[in-house]
Amino acid sequence: MNYVATTCTQPVQVQELIKPYGGNLVNLTVNGEQHRELLEYANRLPSLQLSMRSLCDLELLSVGAFSPLDRFMSRADYQTVLEDMRLKDGTLFPVPITLPVTNRRSVQEGTDIALRSPKNELLAIMTVEEVFEWNAAQEARLVLGTTDVRHPLVAEMASWGGAYISGPLKVLNLPKHYDFSELRKTPAEVHARLQSLGYSNVVAFQTRNPIHRAHEELTKRASEQVNGALLIHPVVGMTKPGDVDHYTRVRAYRILVERYYDGSRTALSLLPLAMRMAGPREALWHAIIRRNYGVNHFIVGRDHAGPGNDSFGRPFYGPYDAQKLLQKCESEVGVKMIPFQEIVYLPDEDRFEEQHRVPVGVRVATLSGTEVRDRYLSNGKRLPEWFTRPETAAILSKITLPMHQRGFCVWFTGLSGAGKSTIAEILSV
């Protein structure tokens, strides 16, 4: 694999909240009179409809979460990222951020195109500077360490087409979200919130799963360990197929933070990230993203961003590969890795403890994800309070209701563009 073939240097000195990666926070959004003029111009341009993955990438490019990137990668940046995990200027950046097109002939270099959402909403104007070919097998092998189609991204890449495009972006509208708008904060907004808490250190916790008692304990200990604030930063874009839906998760996160975390040192914000499930490279990328939100410590667990097992039943990545790579590069990235310690419950003492600190012979209680699903949720049994907060248990219990108790059907008819899809999306929240 190629995910550790790089030299990491350049220690970063932290003063107050850490500065964005590369020094400045990118902002691609256009406002004022120019916005009105470009809206009229964009509606006369040929359009490219983005996939859900590209939509997520464009949103985070626009607000600076991928700083110092200010566009989908050029051929030169793309190739050096594949081979060395660096942009062409030498900046460490482990994951390619690219915009694929299925029909290369539909896009010409030197022209402007309008980028639109999957629902045809106008988002941005790109001046196409490059159209270049790419090799899916090469990218999968170098970035993911595998060409096995059991890896969800390998399977998806087969539908991307044979070309990438790159060029300057003028973002006219960010993607619309009708759910949890108060929690969808930009890097600048999160930075301001964290600054207001008064801590120079911030530890971030990424998750694509519900937060249970052990995770709660871990995050609280981590913020105390660094004497800093805590950013709970769950992914609500594209995660691993089969994950609990983000609507359910965010309802649980919100009530958990409100009732069980110290509001004077905790912030909750949602990250519309399209994960690659790229293991070690992805962990390093996640740390870079968090730095752009004002974070200088990042919790990394076993098999961080791993997609499970390959076609032979073996894990795609080693359990500590992600921790090792981030630890190797943490001084250059400016984000210190905090390893996820296994936390277990001691029923005889009614407390949580790190697994390696538990004396031999002391009784412990744990539940696996399979047990949670098959033993409790699928049978309508409430999860025990030592394992998860009762509010979380109540929310999770609703996702396993019998089908006849789930939701309702609304039938829409009308002309194209009448707003059927928009209304349906709002109702789904």
Predicted regions and their residues:
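Active-site cores that bind ATP or allylic diphosphates and position pyrophosphate for catalysis
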Residues: 2-404
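Walker A (P-loop) phosphate-binding motif
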Residues: 404-429
